[in-house]
Design a protein with these regions (language model features):
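Catalytic cores of peptidoglycan-degrading enzymes
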Residues: 169-184
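Boundary regions of SH3-family modules and the immediately adjacent low-complexity/disordered segments
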Residues: 1-14, 19-48, 55-88, 99-109, ...
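A eukaryote-biased sequence property
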Residues: 91-94
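Internal, well-ordered alpha/beta segment that forms a basic, Gly-enriched binding/recognition surface
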Residues: 113
Length: 184
């Protein structure tokens, strides 16, 4: 299997230490939690398993259910780096509503740190139209959108060094190790 890029489409997904056992259960530890709209790289699909081995945009690896992600292209990953278009949700949770008003019907729940695409800012004062990782569109309070501080460049096929996330970040910052450690 060739590695490929994907984004999380589930509300959130648990990054597991291992794939499921022969009974289809995953009793392994939870290594991390990843959220809707986050980019990942699929590293391996084990025959007959529902879990894929992935690597996150910050260098963690583990297993997630195949149904919790969808493939994207390198071009789509590149477009997602536009910080005027892709934002992180900055509140613990928010309803994605069908209309730009408090009385709108909830379509889905968005969790803190999920990545959404801004489709239209301030459609009415205080409300913006967004699209979440699975593709559903709706409205949220504009004040809940936060600038992404990170990017997904580590997952790019252009990053072929294979020396790990922190090495790649250090190279991008082009600083001495001591300075780099202080920054992270």
């Amino acid at each position: 299997m060739k590695e490929y890029l994907a984004i999380v489409t589930a509300e959130h997904a648990y990054l597991r230490a291992e794939a499921e056992n022969e009974n289809g259960e995953n009793l392994s530890g939870i290594e991390d939690e990843i959220f809707s709209g986050w980019a990942v790289k699929v590293l391996e699909k084990l025959p007959g398993k529902q879990y894929l081995k992935i690597e996150t945009h910050y260098g963690y690896s583990g297993y997630v259910k195949e149904e919790e992600i969808k493939p994207i292209t390198e071009d789509e990953l590149e477009k997602r780096q536009d910080k005027d278009r892709f934002f992180r949700l900055g509140i613990s949770e928010a309803d994605l509503l069908d209309a730009p008003k408090v009385q709108g019907l909830p379509l889905e729940l968005l969790l803190k740190s999920c990545i959404v695409e801004l489709l239209e800012k301030e459609v009415v004062p205080g409300w913006s139209k967004v699209r979440r990782g699975a593709g559903r569109e709706g409205f949220i309070h504009t004040v809940n959108l936060r600038e992404r501080k990170e990017d997904d460049g580590y997952l790019s096929e252009k990053n072929t060094e294979g020396k790990g996330y922190f090495h790649a970040m250090r190279q991008r910052l082009a600083v001495e190790e001591e300075t780099f450690r202080e920054r992270i």
